Amino acid sequence: MSIRRLPEATVARLPVYLRVLAEATEGTISSEHLAAGAGVNAAQVRKDLSHLGSYGTRGVGYDVAYLVRQINRQLGLTADRRVAIVGIGNLGHALARYGGFATRGFRVVAAFDVDPSTVGQQVGGVLVEPFERLAEVIEGKGVELALLTTPAASAQAAADALVAAGVNSILNFAPARVAAPPHVAVRQVDLGVELQILCYYGLQAAAGLTAYDAVDAAGS
């Protein structure tokens, strides 16, 4: 199966569908059931899954195991992905200890920091290495993805080091945008911005719109 180019909003919903499918108790699932668990409507589910070439069977629904395989292949989750965390402050500590990564096909295998008092610690079962060893450890452990949780001032230098070491995907939690070459995927996660967006949807909810209605009205 080739990797299809999907709308960004559809990509964002696929992991939610996976979560609902993981909780399914039968071998098939209807678009209505999948929609209820994902917080969207059934028409949206059918549209999203049609992008994968999956149309279900009228009166039966979707084969759960097959749909899980389709979504995992589209997301590149057919095997465990090795992850590194750069910056072991409060957020880095929390992410290193988060147990939900493993259940979704991600394994944190490396952690890095510049603080001598943090280097050498075990966090979430992973040894914190000095930043100077980043390239060596990344290559040795086959890391493909990185979580960037450094201060803003050092985020770009850390991203540059990750790219040079061969990391091809970066999830940036630092409060500063980082640049990377076209062959490297970067997603920026600014928690302050997320709170601002949440405030907007809070106003919509207070006005009587559901979260889905608010998103739909915004053109997603």
Describe the function of each predicted region.
Residues I88:
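Glycine-rich Rossmann-fold phosphate-binding loop(s) that bind the pyrophosphate
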Residues G99-T103, L162-A165:
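Short, solvent-exposed amphipathic alpha-helical segments in soluble enzyme
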Residues L91:
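Hydrophobic/small residue at the entry helix of a nucleotide-binding pocket
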Residues M1-G27:
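Extreme N-terminal segment that seeds HTH/winged-HTH DNA-binding domains in transcriptional regulators
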Residues T28, E32-V83:
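HTH-adjacent hinge/linker in prokaryotic transcriptional regulators
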Residues A102-V126:
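NAD(P)-binding Rossmann-fold cofactor-contacting core
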Residues Y17-E26, V126-S220:
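Phosphate-bearing ligand-interacting subdomains
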